[in-house]
UniProtKB/Swiss-Prot annotation:
ATP binds at R202, N203, V204, K214. Its main location: endoplasmic reticulum. The modification Phosphothreonine is found at T8, T322. This is Phosphatidylinositol 5-phosphate 4-kinase type-2 beta. GO terms for molecular function: 1-phosphatidylinositol-4-phosphate 5-kinase activity; 1-phosphatidylinositol-5-phosphate 4-kinase activity; ATP binding; GTP binding; protein homodimerization activity. The modification N-acetylserine is found at S2. Participates in the biosynthesis of phosphatidylinositol 4,5-bisphosphate. Preferentially utilizes GTP, rather than ATP, for PI(5)P phosphorylation and its activity reflects changes in direct proportion to the physiological GTP concentration. Its GTP-sensing activity is critical for metabolic adaptation. In collaboration with PIP4K2A, has a role in mediating autophagy in times of nutrient stress. Required for autophagosome-lysosome fusion and the regulation of cellular lipid metabolism. PIP4Ks negatively regulate insulin signaling through a catalytic-independent mechanism. Its EC number is 2.7.1.149.
Length: 416
């Protein structure tokens, strides 16, 4: 099952690049015709499909309440001989959206406007991330880094259907204030007879603050170190033992720690009730002083580049500006923030370090990978690991109740 993969469902702003957007002029080119140009057909189909389904939904009145059938519903379209724009889109493809009314309702509860969501996915092609699950799970981010697009398996789609009603009810009850993944859309794309399933979530990390270090934490210490291959990446995903061996702590202060752990406990109890396990806490750390230094270096380079571009009369785009063949956007221009500042309505998982912390940091923390039920395969894996490591070892495949308890205890110990 693809859910056995460990993966990172957040995409960080790459160091030494995010700050370019502050100094470069932004030229947003509004196109009369949308051209869903991307480096590969599957992404063009995703852009076309999200654009189509959001447009269709805009004509459907918002119901007073969701009905049981909404959790089984889908919309699908088959496109044949699509001659218009054929240099970008395949001539034949199919696009299916699962539970459109439910995900529209979830987007609203998470404070995400459908027009903004549509623009983020369709205005410019999604960007590949170097984050990848062991089973080849693929991650992309929308051009503005606000949303993450993840390929999933048909089993994951089935599990989403299994939990969606209870997940939606939980989001209603907590008013969208949760550390759980914010599921915003689920799709099936068929190109050349190959089916690809994709889920869109809010990015855990900031769309503008650089993440300098990140961790995938499960509360388990058996085989929980980053591989040498992972460590060679620009922004490796470190694990539990790496975190402990570094003596790392997240300095949030007593009040923030209390509030965070209360939210975490509620979320994790919900997952245990659903018999879900193997989830992680994804942690990203933004070093404010380091970011300021990087920004100064980037600004110097950006000014030189701007002079060169202005010299040849070309309009200079910011790192996620509109290419000349992309649809325009209604999103407002980003506000300017001071070092380490963020908009809590956008960076919903962000938390500042306490003023007494040794370094000024911003932490991004959320639960990821919640589509792993405790089924027969997990029970067999648990038995095998218990034989290998002993009954007392902190292996990752324990039952959901044990997993949630251990998870909460570990997270309580890393916050200070």
């Amino acid at each position: 099952m693809s859910s056995n993969c460990t993966s990172t469902t957040a995409v960080a702003v790459a160091p030494l690049s995010a700050s370019k957007t502050k100094t470069k002029k932004k030229h947003f080119v509004c196109q009369k015709v949308k051209l869903f140009r991307a480096s590969e057909p599957i992404l063009s189909v995703l852009m076309w499909g999200v654009n189509h389904t959001i447009n269709e939904l805009s004509n459907v009145p918002v119901p007073v309440m969701l009905m049981p059938d909404d959790f089984k519903a889908y919309s699908k379209i088959k496109v044949d001989n699509h001659l218009f724009n054929k240099e970008n889109l395949p001539s034949r493809f199919k696009f299916k959206e699962y539970c459109p009314m439910v995900f529209r309702n979830l987007r609203e509860r998470f404070g995400i406007d459908d027009q903004d969501y549509q623009n983020s996915v369709t205005r410019s092609a999604p960007i590949n991330s170097d984050s990848q699950g062991r089973c080849g799970t693929r991650f992309l981010t929308t051009y503005d880094r606000r949303f993450v697009i993840k390929t999933v398996s048909s089993e994951d789609v089935a599990e989403m259907h299994n939990i969606l009603k209870k997940y939606h009810q939980f989001i209603v009850e907590c008013h969208g204030n949760t550390l759980l993944p914010q599921f915003l859309g689920m799709y099936r794309l068929t190109v050349d007879g190959v089916e690809t399933y994709m889920v869109v979530t809010r990015n855990v990390f900031s769309h503008r603050l650089t993440v300098h270090r990140k961790y995938d934490l499960k509360g388990s210490t058996v085989a929980r170190e980053a591989s040498d291959k992972e460590k060679a990446k620009d922004l490796p995903t470190f694990k539990d033992n790496d975190f402990l061996n570094e003596g790392q702590k997240l300095h949030v202060g007593e009040e923030s720690k209390k509030n965070f752990l209360e939210k975490l406990k509620r979320d994790v109890e919900f997952l245990a009730q659903l018999k879900i396990m193997d989830y992680s806490l994804l942690v990203g750390i933004h070093d404010v002083d380091r970011a300021e230094q990087e920004e100064m270096e980037v600004e110097e380079r950006a000014e030189e580049e701007e002079c060169e571009n202005d010299g040849v009369g070309g309009s200079l785009l910011c790192s996620y500006g509109t290419p000349p063949d992309s649809p325009g956007n209604l999103l407002s221009f980003p506000r300017f923030f001071g070092p380490g500042e963020f908009d809590p309505s956008v960076d919903v998982y962000a938390m500042k370090s306490h003023e007494s912390a040794p370094k000024k940091e911003v932490y991004f923390m959320a639960i990821i990978d919640i589509l792993t039920p405790y089924d027969a395969k997990k029970k067999a894996a648990h038995a095998a690991k218990t034989v290998k490591h002993g009954a007392g070892a902190e292996i990752s495949t324990v039952n959901p109740e044990q997993y949630s308890k251990r998870f909460n205890e570990f997270m309580s110990n890393i916050l200070t």
